[in-house]
Amino acid sequence: MRIYSATDVGQKRKMNQDYVFVSEGPVGNLPNLFTVADGMGGHNAGDYASSHAVRILVDEIREDADYNPVKVIRHAIEAANTEIRNRAQEDENLRGMGTTMVVATIVDQYAYVANVGDSRLYVIQDGIRQVTRDHSLVQEMVRMGEISEAEARNHPDKNIITRALGAEKTVDVDFFDLKLEKGCTILMCSDGLSNMVEDEKIQEIISDPEADIDQKGSALLREANQNGGKDNIA
């Protein structure tokens, strides 16, 4: 397994509210752990929400005695949701904060994926496939047939999400499991990448046979910034 991770503040924001956690080795009973979180909130609340939620997630996973990856991740996300919501209610400077979160662990030949919000997980191999489903207003409109995927990319409400950690007392988490084929690439990212770079361009960069994993990752960040870098990128 070869891994690249990075965050970038982008071209328009002063603060980076994206947060990434990567462990190729065990975290608790999980053999590895990969997480992207995209925080939201005024002042430094979004930065706090994403980083604190991931810290809670990792701590909970380390303490969990269960071996079922779905149960372990679900419990950890629920704990992070409760903590973020409680902190937002206790501290007026953090009021209204929240964060997206996409989490993955690879067990044998299977990836177990959890998602809240509009951060994404893709699989790239002979094409590109978005595994997660965005919890966003425009995606709901697409599902209902009100707008097309092309219209969704430039819709004025495309940044409005319908689920986030810290938004409600309980959090609704989507889970996916997929069998991984040899040679496939998994990409986890915030909307600062997926809103700035078309899926086809992502596939082109990832599939470049001349580039190594670090060069591909750097190329994705560079492409997002060259296209406007309107948000933080992870």
What do the PLM-derived regions correspond to, one by one?
Residues M1-A234:
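PP2C/PPM-type serine/threonine phosphatase catalytic domain
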